[in-house]
Amino acid sequence: MSDNSKTRVVVGMSGGVDSSVTALLLKEQGYDVIGIFMKNWDDTDENGVCTATEDYKDVVAVADQIGIPYYSVNFEKEYWDRVFEYFLAEYRAGRTPNPDVMCNKEIKFKAFLDYAMTLGADYVATGHYARVARDEDGTVHMLRGVDNGKDQTYFLSQLSQEQLQKTMFPLGHLKKPEVRKLAEEAGLSTAKKKDSTGICFIGEKNFKNFLSNYLPAQPGRMMTVDGRDMGEHAGLMYYTIGQRGGLGIGGQHGGDNAPWFVVGKDLSKNILYVGQGFYHDSLMSTSLEASQVHFTREMPEEFTLECTAKFRYRQPDSKVTVHVKGDKAEVIFAEPQRAITPGQAVVFYDGEECLGGGLIDNAYRDGQVCQYI
């Protein structure tokens, strides 16, 4: 059996059950483990709800239980500059961002990783549901977590080969109930703690109210694609492509009881387009353009790839053909896709392996750009 005691692993601990069990498993495997609590958002701000103080108490309790040193590190400035400013800029541009993807890329596997290296870390570890496989030549492949319902490779798709080489995902081979059971068997204080939901800096707070504190709302007209005025919208930033709720219109218009969905935006005219039917023509597209395209392993500057893709978290894979040129890609769908949303991540897979991904700029229907921004 290899001697892990000379290998230092710094664990990102959130105060939740997943990162608690991550630290526990590594400690049981004999590694030299240090726990780090990342404070990314100012919880004294009256506009944001964050349970950082309580979460840190949970980290302290677990670290004491399993016998590892721990520190709290403040990454609020890095988070604001690298994640939150991006989040606001995307909403200003009429897009729907995915801050979790950027948080992993810029904070958990950059700012945190850099800090861990100053502590003499050989690796960092997190409670993400993903796996890494290492080739003999040192190349690392990122694989889906075995728990399909919890697999988080979608959010990790922007990680680089260098970041992955320094990363461990001890929970990747486990399913969530198994993780909770391990926590209970070890008597960890976080064993029954509920999973966090929503974006970390908003917590359980009303998203609309939160966003309006940073971006002034600009109400405008809500219209059908054929020009019927359907009333007023509260501000384009509050709506995402394919959204059903919150429109304030029922099936009464024109006598058709089919539900209404957001089918488009016109940022220049401040118009929100709506249509009836889950598979409304305006929601369907046949290809997309992506930027900030990145692969977890070294790839040629220009190439074509047949693979599968996800366009949102927990969505079944879809067959695609990807034409890559630099950090941009055209992604052609084998079957038309619904509600491809600018700002969201498109993530590429080859079987179990997550190859990387990019950010969706535009969706196209038979060569014509969809009016999604």
UniProtKB/Swiss-Prot annotation:
Its EC number is 2.8.1.13. Residues 98-100 are annotated as: Interaction with target base in tRNA. It is found in: Cytoplasm. The active site is at C103 (nucleophile), C200 (cysteine persulfide intermediate). Residues 150-152, 312-313 are annotated as: Interaction with tRNA. GO terms for molecular function: ATP binding; tRNA binding; tRNA-uridine 2-sulfurtransferase activity. GO terms for cellular component: cytoplasm. Coiled coil: none annotated. It comes from the Bacteria. The keyword Disulfide bond applies. The record marks H128, Q344 as: Interaction with tRNA. Disulfide bonds join C103-C200. Catalyzes the 2-thiolation of uridine at the wobble position (U34) of tRNA, leading to the formation of s(2)U34. Belongs to the MnmA/TRMU family. PANTHER family: MITOCHONDRIAL TRNA-SPECIFIC 2-THIOURIDYLASE 1 (PTHR11933:SF5), TRNA 5-METHYLAMINOMETHYL-2-THIOURIDYLATE -METHYLTRANSFERASE (PTHR11933). This is tRNA-specific 2-thiouridylase MnmA. The gene is mnmA.
